[in-house]
Curated annotation (Swiss-Prot):
Compartment list: Nucleus
Organism: Drosophila mojavensis
GO CC terms: nucleus
PROSITE patterns, alphabetized: G_PATCH (PS50174), ZF_C3H1 (PS50103)
Predominant localisation class: nucleus
Keyword Transcription regulation set for record: yes
Protein name: Zinc finger CCCH-type with G patch domain-containing protein
Length: 509
């Protein structure tokens, strides 16, 4: 009893001297424990006199006494050697300053008491020493969580820019969490190869928080993933996320599988000869499959022609799975090479009738092939297009006559020959056709005149730019030449119309 009272007196004296808030909190807690222990000891004195005190109670009190004495010794040691504490603080600060800017995995205690580790970024070192649960001096680090799941973990944007007007206590967002340096773990990089159906992930939403969800499907080519978010508060539960906004969660089973794979890798690494043998075997298999694709494959059509309907996504997926172009499917490369062709049987005919039709065609397996029918229809359409083009090329209209006969740029002999063979093809057209062509040419002339006016305005506006002036002059000359061509065509049409009017007047009596 006297020892407890002496220890309580020492604690009270230490409270009067100590100014550090953390040490004062520890001393106050120690004072409370000592007072409770004294109260229990006074209450157990009658039982001790009557020999009813159990061995377990005495052992517990002795353990608590030893623990309190060790804590008092630590406090006295800290008060007695401030220089040593300062030296220890400098050593820890030097050690942790080299970790500034590094990624790590830091603990976070939620409001309901649960403790979980999250990826974070070390951004500072605290200036005060602390005593961890093992009684070892340590320093707290200030970390910012990179995948915040709750609002108290969300970093303050204004604090990162140095413009936050609130302190750490009043700000609704995080200015960095203080965690002991000994509790820091290695950074867990996201492993996107784990992404698969029903895989648990964290997905980043517009509120900058990472919400839990489960994977529905993964596209490793475009690096996108469809996730169904947990909880009923999300209006759109199923969304598409890029890989940059996802973080695959590692479960206990995945850790076990990873540890087993690491152990197997260590076992395999001890036998380098077996690895080299496996590599040689894989290389030989690849060479054999390439040989099969070069010497045994006799294509009847262009390899991969079916990809014109799929934008090439099929070949990309097969290449990611290890497929070698030109080889068959399967591990030995002896499967089919060309895709299975679709077959459409005649409507309303039985299977026996369809088999008879195929036998009548000498057993042609592709007799009902859709691709063959499409190719046959395509060839027919191409032949029809060629015939239509030939008919259109032989047909002579007013513009063809004006371009070739009246305003052609060929030699004089060609013009003379055209004049001998076709003295005036405009006479073959009706008055209605000539009137329509006259109106069209007049519209083209007005449009061309407007274009020339715009080019001239550009020349006047950009008089100082030599390169632009040169290009505009070339464009102006081309426009004027086209205008002259149109005016010549209009003159020819007007002359033909005037000739017809004169003939009509001559025949009138």
């Amino acid at each position: 009893m006297d020892e407890y009272e002496a220890q309580l007196l020492v604690v009270k004296q230490a409270l009067l001297v100590t100014s550090d808030e953390q040490q004062r909190d520890e001393l106050i807690a120690l004072q409370t424990n000592l007072e409770e222990l004294l109260a229990l000891t006074r209450g157990s004195e009658p039982e001790a006199t009557s020999d009813t005190k159990t061995p377990e109670t005495s052992d517990n009190i002795d353990d608590e006494l030893q623990r309190f004495q060790s804590e008092l010794i630590d406090l006295e040691h800290q008060q007695a050697d401030p220089g040593e504490d300062q030296q220890r603080l400098e050593e820890l600060r030097t050690k942790y300053n080299g970790l500034l800017g590094e990624k790590c995995s830091a603990p976070h205690e939620h409001s309901w008491g649960a403790l979980s580790y999250h990826n974070a970024l070390i951004c500072g070192v605290d200036d005060e020493l602390i005593v961890d649960k093992n009684g070892i001096l340590d320093v707290r680090l200030r970390v910012l969580f990179t995948n915040p799941t709750h609002r108290e973990m969300l970093p303050c944007n204004y604090f990162l820019e140095g413009e936050c007007r609130f302190d750490e206590v009043r700000c609704r967002y995080s200015h960095g969490a203080l965690v002991p340096g000994s509790s820091i773990k290695d950074y867990k990089a996201p492993d996107f190869h784990r992404l698969a159906r029903n895989c648990s992930v964290l997905a980043k939403l517009q509120d900058r928080l990472w919400h839990r969800g489960r994977v529905l499907c993964v596209n490793f080519v475009e690096q996108q993933c469809r996730v169904r978010l947990d909880g009923q508060e999300h209006k759109e539960r199923e969304r598409d996320f890029p890989f940059e906004e996802l973080f695959p969660l590692v479960t206990a089973e995945d850790d076990d599988l990873t540890s087993e794979s690491e152990e197997s890798n260590e076992t395999d690494g001890s036998d380098a000869g077996n690895d080299s043998d496996m590599d040689d075997f894989e290389a030989a298999r690849q060479a054999r499959m390439v040989e099969l694709s070069l010497f045994t494959f006799k294509p009847t059509e262009r390899l991969g022609a079916w990809e014109q309907y799929t934008r090439g996504i099929g070949s990309k997926l097969m290449a990611n799975m290890g497929y070698i172009h030109g080889t068959g499917l399967g591990s030995d490369g002896r499967g089919i090479v060309t895709p299975v062709s679709a077959q459409i049987l005649p409507q309303g005919r039985s299977l026996d009738a369809c088999m008879e039709l195929r036998e009548a065609a000498n057993g042609d397996k592709d007799y009902f092939s859709v691709e063959r029918k499409l190719k046959r229809a395509q060839r027919r359409q191409e032949a029809a297009n060629e015939k239509a083009y030939e008919r259109a090329s032989k047909r002579t209209d007013v513009f063809a006559f004006l371009n070739t006969s009246v305003l052609g740029q060929g030699s004089q002999q060609t013009e003379n020959a055209n004049k001998k063979t076709k003295p005036n093809n405009l006479q073959q057209h009706s008055n209605k056709t000539l009137n329509v062509e006259t109106v069209r040419i007049a519209d083209d002339i007005r449009r061309k005149q407007r274009d020339i006016a715009k080019v001239q305005q550009s020349l006047a506006r950009n008089a100082t730019d030599a390169q632009l002036q040169k290009r505009l002059n070339v464009q102006l000359q081309a426009q004027k030449q086209e205008l002259a061509t149109l005016q010549a065509q209009e003159t020819s049409l007007c002359k033909e119309q005037q000739t017809r009017k004169s003939k009509n007047k001559m025949f009138e009596f």
